[in-house]
Design a protein with these regions (language model features):
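Noncatalytic, helix-rich "gating/capping" subdomain that lines the substrate-entry/channel surface
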Residues: 1, 6-10, 14-192
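Zinc-dependent metallohydrolase catalytic domains
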Residues: 187-319, 326-509
Length: 509
């Protein structure tokens, strides 16, 4: 309670400080304190009508096809003014849209103007005067995230350029940092993971033959995007001023170009070859509406992937991530989409019920877990097992399937996962880690652990619990490994103090 009140007070102070850069005449006769209070009051009203994080990720609740002409008049006006053509739209939160329409009419126009000024100032603070950027960082960087200093100016500059012309930078990144043979190796790993999923789905005890065949059909339709797009995006028509130009004007030009680019897609068939991220993004993605997985070039480096590493390490790191992303196609939300990306009920009711029995156990395992960095710091909300369910299913399936894939890889060569050095395009790899020798299965789990070694500030950890559908890194590592039988096979001593009690362990995929 005290912490919330402190945060709310900081929120008002932050806006007061930022709005203080304006002359009162620019704030419609209000001073910065009153303006800040009115902005926060309006934002609070808007936020109160948002759905919670669990409902917001529900693919059925958020799929509400509606004709533009059926929306409240003022919402139609706003969308039309933004360039959206007539036709069908998907309304994710119908009740929120209705309440927003009411606020647009009932809240004084001056409050909306102040809110617009604040929103623009906040979004452009990083490219305005140094004192504006510093004031913005003081709250969003220090108060909310715990950071003590801004990133170097050149790093902020690169991030800005990436936000405006990301794929152009991606070309240069790929040319310099992405070896051609990495793509071939990744595709080989993907094949091993897909085959392992097919093997597991074919023998699932809780799934009926009818649903099993549809799941295998979806798996066969998966597409993998590795490294970089086959066709680069064109930025033709986007013009920036050069030396001595106006930085804010350049940012506005980039934002307008991106807006027009996105609006132009409306009403047209989805481009299944388009990428959801730039090659220099350190992340991986599953896109349910096109049923594909994406692995940008930048994630294909240690600790996730190393073309010169031991097979166990690549299966335990990037292999588990591949399995995680494929697993999103079969998590609590992704499983509602068919192999062509359509929201379609392809499960029998009985299979869906059995699936939800298993996922309920997983929710229970994670619910309320408090990350180490927040222990002893007063009341913490802890992990929300429902909110993080999709990512936890992905993690659990990803590592479990990676173990199967690794065993299959070794079996093809007549090798034993409990034996010494087993390599994958890596003649110089070693079984030693920090001077101690481990067998293949052990090295796979150690690679998984290495991926999740993380340092995080308490402020950021608390923020992530509220907004991030992923569990904290320590639980992504330990809870997942604790559910997998091969972990205790690899480390028998772990059974004495099991990470997850044997009767509570969950295997879904």
């Amino acid at each position: 309670s005290t912490r919330k009140e402190s945060s709310a007070a900081s929120d008002v102070y932050k806006r007061q400080q930022m709005l203080g850069f304006f002359h009162p005449t620019q704030l419609f006769g209000t001073g910065p304190i009153e303006a800040a209070e009115r902005v926060v009051a309006l934002e609070t009203q808007i936020a109160s009508h948002h759905w919670d994080v669990v409902a917001s990720r529900d693919s059925l609740k958020t799929y509400n096809p509606t004709e533009l002409g059926e929306l409240p008049d003022i919402i139609q006006t706003l969308l039309t003014a933004s360039g959206l053509p007539e036709g069908r739209v998907i309304v994710m939160m119908p009740s929120f849209v209705d309440k927003l329409a009411e606020l647009l009419v009932s809240v004084p126009l001056t409050d909306w103007k102040l809110w617009a000024i604040w929103s623009i100032l906040r979004s452009r603070a990083g490219v305005l005067r140094e004192d504006v950027g510093a004031a913005n960082f003081e709250f969003y960087g220090t108060v909310l995230s715990g950071a003590t200093e801004q990133r170097d100016r050149w790093k902020r500059g690169v991030a800005l350029a990436e936000s405006l012309v990301g794929e152009d930078l991606g070309k240069a990144y790929v040319d310099k940092h992405f070896p051609a043979d990495s793509k071939a190796q990744m595709l080989e790993l993907v094949d091993y993971l897909v085959d392992a999923y097919e093997q597991r789905i074919s023998t699932l005890p809780w799934m009926s033959p009818e649903t099993r065949e549809r799941a295998l059909e979806k798996l066969r339709l998966f597409n993998a995007k590795i490294g970089y797009p086959d066709t680069w995006r064109s930025y033709e028509g986007l013009e920036f001023s050069r030396e001595g130009g106006d930085l804010v004007a350049n940012v506005r030009a980039g934002a307008a170009f991106e807006h027009d680019y996105q609006v132009a897609k409306v009403g047209k068939p989805a481009d299944r070859n388009e990428w959801v991220a730039t090659p220099q993004t350190v992340n991986a993605f599953y896109n349910p509406v096109v049923n594909d997985i994406t692995f940008p070039a930048a994630i294909l480096q240690p600790p996730f992937f190393d073309p010169a590493a031991d097979a166990a390490e690549n299966f335990g790191a990037i292999g588990a991530v591949i399995g995680h992303e494929i697993g999103h196609g079969f998590d609590d939300q992704g499983s509602r989409y068919d192999g062509h990306g359509n929201l379609n009920s392809w499960w029998t009711d009985e299979d869906r019920a059995r699936f939800e029995e298993l996922t309920a156990k997983l929710v229970k395992q994670y619910d309320g877990l408090v990350p180490t960095v927040l222990e002893g710091r007063g009341e913490s909300r802890g992990v929300n097992g429902e909110f993080t369910l999709g990512e936890n299913i992905g993690d659990l399936g990803g590592l479990g399937i990676a173990v199967i894939a690794y065993k299959n890889y070794l079996a093809e060569q007549g090798l034993d996962p409990r034996g010494p050095v087993q390599t994958f395009h890596a003649p110089g790899a070693t079984a030693e880690i920090d001077g101690q020798e481990f067998d293949g299965l052990q090295r796979l789990f150690l690679a998984w652990a290495r991926v999740w070694r993380t340092a995080i500030r308490p402020e950021m950890a608390e923020q992530y619990l509220a907004i991030d559908p992923h569990s904290p890194a320590e639980f992504r590592c330990n809870v997942v490994a604790g559910n997998i039988a091969e972990f205790y096979e690899a480390f028998p001593e772990a059974s004495a103090e099991a990470l997850v009690a044997e009767d509570d362990r969950v295997v879904i995929w």
